């Protein structure tokens, strides 16, 4: 069995996000985990597909995107186009997936 490490950038400072991603690019981690929160499904608010797209410009790591949002079906294609490689979401709130 092979273990994959997927560090989350959520704990980092968004004012220093480029440095965080560049450091992760130099690490042995194969994945970068993004916790996307909409302020509705969960009380916190993080970032959207444009942020994923911007980060994709300077990283070739696997983007592991965790959508903690309502109406995943409305936004799924946006996150795919943004450069997500893996998308995880909560099925209990999405009837049309």
Locations of the language-model features?
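Conserved N-terminal beta1-alpha1 strand-loop-helix module at the mouth
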Residues: 1-82, 86, 94-96
């Amino acid at each position: 069995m092979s273990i994959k490490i997927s560090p989350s950038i959520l704990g980092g400072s968004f004012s220093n996000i480029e440095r965080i991603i560049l450091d992760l690019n130099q690490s042995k981690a194969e994945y970068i985990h993004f916790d996307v929160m909409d302020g509705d499904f969960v009380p916190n608010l993080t970032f959207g597909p444009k942020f994923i797209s911007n980060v994709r410009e300077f990283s070739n790591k696997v983007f592991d995107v965790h959508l903690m949002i309502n109406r995943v079906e409305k936004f799924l294609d946006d996150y795919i186009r943004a450069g997500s490689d893996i998308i995880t979401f909560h099925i209990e709130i999405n009837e049309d997936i």
